Structure formats: structure tokens, C-alpha cells
Amino acid sequence: MKRLLFLTLILIPTLLMGCSEQEVYLFSYFKGNGEDGLHLAKSEDGRNWTSLKGDTSFLKPELSRDKLMRDPCIIIGGDGLFHMVWTVSWTEKGIGYASSKDLITWSEQKFIPVMAHEEGVRNCWAPEITYDKKSGTYMIYWATTIDGRFTETVEPKESNLSHRMYATTTKDFKTFSPTFLLYDHGFSVIDSTIIPDGDRFVMFLKDETRSPVAQKNIRVSYAEKLEGPYSAPSEPITGKYWAEGPTVLREADGS
């Protein structure tokens, strides 16, 4: 669940950069267990990165008993605001949300109890947001294990976890649709990220299978609608090593 999120080409304000405005890629990330909150880095080419504000936190976590800000995911919404979600704890039934006009001053942090309706929920990990311009809808999605569900893929070596991707939609971050199962293709899955690509949506995901044959790789699925259904996964796009936390960068030339 270690991941660095939010790569997009944006115009960063003078206050954030400490210099004149500049169009760059921005990288959101956390350090350690996420105790000190949101960190940001910039890049002009998507390959060489410089941390901002001396690699100190832009926002301290306030939610849950653990007060963590892991896996921060930020997008620019249709309203021009920066919208961020994050993992607030290893074991909570919800996620964190905040918004900002400039990445410096943030709204009040809000706990969204996305899995509070379910018994046996173990976690809500690595939430992300994708915006559908056509419908004006935001979809928030994350990985959860529910005790007693998908027992055929429970992994004894990993605390009997068996994750699937769940989601909710909203247009205003005030009211949310009922949580629904977003992705289940018969294996444990975490760390999904979805981008629009023309008339389709592309999901990059981690196959979390450890036994009998370890996968731990990144695969790709496709859907005509943001809410799915998503196709069966591709073959791994990563090599013979364990990978997780994919982030997608669309370069300035659109590739």
C-alpha cells in the first residue's frame, strides 16, 4: 500500500513554488506511515523530481484514531478545485476527504464512512478519485477486505486478507451513492487507478495474489463507463518483481 499519487500537468501558483507561475507535473505522496501528512513534489519532465517546501507537510492529518494521511490522491475537479482523498488508518471503515483552491489552504477534513454499513470490514485502503466530464460525476474507489467474503482468495500469509475494489459516486462531495462492488475478477486486488482515454476508461490495478503462485503485478482493465463493468485483466505489464501503487502519467504531447 505504499504509493505516490497524482501526476498531472498543472499550473502551480507562485506561493507554492516560491517563484513565478510554472506549468509542471505535481506528485502527491506520504512518508513513513503517513503521520505528518501530505507531501508534494514537482517535475518538468515527469522523470526528475524536486520536493516542495523542503519536503515538509502541506497538511497534517486529523481524522481517525490513528491520524494518518497515507496514499493521498488529488485531482482537479470540474469546479476547478483540488479534491483529495486518503487512507486515514489501517483498519477504519472510511476514508478522508478535503479540497483546496491552491494546495496550500485546505477545507476542513471530512471522514466519509464508505463501508460503515458492512459488518466485518477490515480496512479501506488507497482511495482514489476519477472525474467523468460527461456526467459531472466523481467516483471514489478503494480496496477493502470483508471477513467472510471472497474466502476462496483469502491469503493466510497476509493476515487472511482478500481485497476487492469498492466505489461510491458523488457530484458535490456532500451526498454519495450507496457503495457498490467495482471490481471482482476472482482474485485479490488493490491499488486501482482509473483514467479517461477517449470514449473509454482504463483501470490499472495490482493483482494481489500471493499463493499458490505469486502475482503481485500490475494489470490493465477497460470499461465504457466509469462505474464499469470493467473487463477481465490483461497480462501483467510489469516484470518479474513485486509491484504496487501504479500511477499513470500522460505526457505533455498526449502520449
Across the structure, where does each feature detected by a protein language model lie?
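Sec-dependent N-terminal signal peptides
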Residues: L4-L16
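Carbohydrate-active catalytic/glycan-binding domains of CAZyme proteins
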Residues: G18-S255
